[in-house]
Curated annotation (Swiss-Prot):
Record-given protein name: Nucleoid-associated protein VIBHAR_03026
Species this protein is from: Vibrio campbellii (strain ATCC BAA-1116)
Family to which the UniProt record says this protein belongs: Belongs to the YejK family.
InterPro entries in alphabetical order: Nucleoid_associated_NdpA
Keyword tags: Cytoplasm
Keyword Cytoplasm listed: yes
């Protein structure tokens, strides 16, 4: 990939003899060479591919934002910025139960004509290597694919549009780890773009467009499948759902109204682009539900053909069970 590296530095988060988390600061930035460029390129790729990211923007009195502005103006060098930010990050991190040890990386770079600042904690793991004497020895390595404490600032968007609610993005982390809260506190930022809500609004707009266009059931299912296929491809490639691009792939209504025009005319508050949410868009082609010991999922086109729902009795009737399920049932 095309990546231009401006600055990168590593610091270390580790426990001292009192089991307290401390920062071991590197005395200078790393050299910009093939190894550091490859590291940052991999960090960019892995972060870009992570699903379920959160978005936000700085609070007006954010100290971190003030330091960042100083660096962008040349009033504070990158090393000093990384040092003061690393200490602030450590002070916030110790407030949380996931105060992990690891390698703290700050990287300023450009990719595809966009400037970024990346901040992340990379877990260290051990593996085995074969020495020149053909012996087996232990070796440490950065487990980049497992990182779940990372944030990235789109500096180009930040410089041109301070009112944006999404120039800051962060990995939300595993359930129960409150990584989102940590990064918002560390960066002194507020939650911005709600990607889940944007996906839900898109799904409602698709439903309403099909109803407003008076599409037959099969036509509506085909329309929803097209939307799902587009969104799913965007998710798999790590790209965002572009409403104008999606609209261009969909047939207009009978009166010639495009999907994009429909969303604007009806007042759906959709961003021009946003990350797709796999669990939400899946509901375009499937009915999914779980609870009370049941976990049910079936293609939407089966409703009314092999699967019937009676709302009065709250009963779901399935005609023709899958062979493997039928086999299990017949043995009991």
């Amino acid at each position: 990939m095309s990546l231009h590296l401006s600055n990168v530095i590593l610091h270390q988060l580790c426990k001292n003899d009192q089991d307290e988390l401390v920062v071991k600061l590197r005395p200078a930035s790393l050299e910009n060479d093939t190894s550091t460029e490859n590291l940052v390129a991999e960090l960019h790729r892995v972060f870009h591919s992570k699903a379920g990211k959160g978005f936000g923007s700085f609070q007006s009195d954010s100290e971190f934002q003030f330091w960042l502005q100083e660096m962008r103006k040349g009033e504070r060098d990158f090393y000093d910025f990384s040092q003061i930010s690393a200490n602030r990050l450590k002070e916030e991190l110790i407030k949380y139960p996931f105060a992990d040890e690891g390698i703290l990386v700050f990287a300023e770079y450009q990719s595809l004509a966009t400037d970024y600042l990346f901040i992340g904690i990379l877990p260290m793991n051990q593996s085995l290597k074969v020495t020149e004497g053909l012996d087996i020895d232990a070796t440490d390595y950065l487990d980049i694919t497992k990182m779940d404490i990372a944030a990235r600032i789109d500096l180009s968007s930040y410089d041109t549009d301070r009112e944006s609610n999404r120039y800051l993005s962060y990995i939300k982390g595993r359930v129960g780890r409150k990584v989102a809260d940590f990064f918002l506190d560390f960066l002194q930022a507020d939650v911005g773009l709600d990607t889940k809500q944007q996906n839900q609004v898109l799904m409602q707009a698709v439903e309403d467009f099909c109803a407003d266009s008076k599409l037959e059931k099969q036509e509506a299912n085909e329309y929803k499948k097209q939307v799902y296929n587009y969104c799913n491809e965007q998710i798999k490639s790590g790209d965002e759902v572009q409403i104008s691009e999606l609209s261009g792939e969909l047939p207009p209504s009978q009166d010639g109204t495009s999907f994009m025009d429909f969303t604007k005319e009806q007042g759906y508050e959709l961003e021009e682009s946003f990350p797709g949410d796999r669990s939400t868009v899946r509901k375009l082609t499937k009915y999914v539900g779980a609870g009370g010991g049941l976990n049910i999922s079936f293609d939407s086109l089966l409703l009314g053909e092999r699967i019937f729902y009676d709302p009065e009795t709250d009963t779901l009737t399935i005609k023709g069970t899958p062979p493997n399920l039928k086999d299990q049932l017949s043995r009991n």
